[in-house]
Amino acid sequence: MGRSVAVLIQKFLREKGYILDLILLACLVFFLIFWGWNFAVKFFTLLAATFIILRRIDYEKHIWLKRGLLVVFGIGAVSFIIIEALVFTQLGSKEEERADYVIILGSGIKGTELSLTLKQRLDASLDYIRTHPQTPVIVSGGQGPGESISEALAMKNYLVDQGIAPAQIIMEDRSTSTQENLAFSKKIILASGLEHPKIMIVTSDYHMFRSKYIAAKNGYAAEYGISAPSPGYLKPINMIREYFGTVKAFL
């Protein structure tokens, strides 16, 4: 049974594999439009190119190559399952512990307008911020292409519009990645005289595991989290993208 399925797959790839090639190329165009040329898209491009090239190899003549590829793809599949399981553990994170600082991670703006993802992160933070008016809030995000102001300023403006006191908000407006979000925010906290801060991270549900992991690498005393819901139609793509981001964080 297993051998017959393998034969059918090989026949499909040999005769209709160009369909998969076109699907991969369409996905690449989609990713470039929405995400730009970032690590995840580069990694996907490498995988897609590898698949397209390897599909044209006669594995009956190169059995050693076939076995090697099976090992590589097996490791990839196992790592994907493990990492996605870890990501799932933090999807519904909504911790209530008292933190020394709240850190809201940026997620892109258009001009001066918040992206839907960033608005959801800010909305998710409001209950905690209002309940802890003495806890400083760091809004973290620099200014990227197509952004008229920094993400930090856009976030501060939104929180102030929601009734949060400007004095409670601290802007970190240089970061361009999750690593920089948390590293630059820690410098701000250390400058205040607090050496071992406990932080409440606010970010998207799919992004929480990686954010906590990177925060731990940056030496925070404790990392709590409030996960913001992400659009359902983008969840599969975000989860796949997060796999690549987490692999990069582990390296």
Which residues make up each language-model segment?
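Extended hydrophobic blocks
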Residues: 1-99, 188-251
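A structural signal for short, hydrophobic/glycine-enriched beta-strand patches
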Residues: 82-241
